[in-house]
Amino acid sequence: GKTTTTSMITTALELAGRDPSAVIGGKLPLIHGYGKAGKGDDIVIEACEFSETFLKLTPYLSVVLNIDNDHLDYYGSMGELKFAFKRFALMTQFMIFANADDKNTMDVMYTLDRRVRTFGIDNDGDYQAINVQEYKPGFFEFDLKEWSKVTGHIRLAVPGRHNIYNALAMCAVCR
């Protein structure tokens, strides 16, 4: 999800004419590579929790899509992994965008004294996908609800229900 979300955010900023810099874990055709040095003020970085590399960053905004069993060989326990995410969140300067449907993520967010905005499908987040429909096998569309108002309709060109979360994160960040 990190690469897709980073790509979606970079694409949205590009299409808005903001010319962002980007470091992405996968190739984004729009920018012809894995990253670019833009002339705008925005920098989009795909951060990874492996060996605490994300703790070297001090983001202005951050997105937490989920906290799952990845890298428990390094952290030793889910508690230690959650603590690393808490430290990452505390280094965020302005706002954290968090998946309201991921219990581990919300366990961490509830402990913070930071500005947090949530997104999700099942739980009532600040940004929520409602009226989710599969318009062809594996591809989804939905209405975007921001706070309590429907503000648009999104039809994803990438397959998988998980990409609804990636798109919600992009919408929240780019708002």
Where are these regions (language model features)?
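Phosphate-binding loop of NTP-binding sites
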Residues: G1-A100, N104-R115, E146, L168-R175
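Short small-residue beta-strand/loop micro-motif enriched in glycine and branched aliphatics
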Residues: H71, V150-I154, I164
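Short acidic/polar mixed-charge low-complexity motifs
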Residues: D41, N123-G125, S148-G152
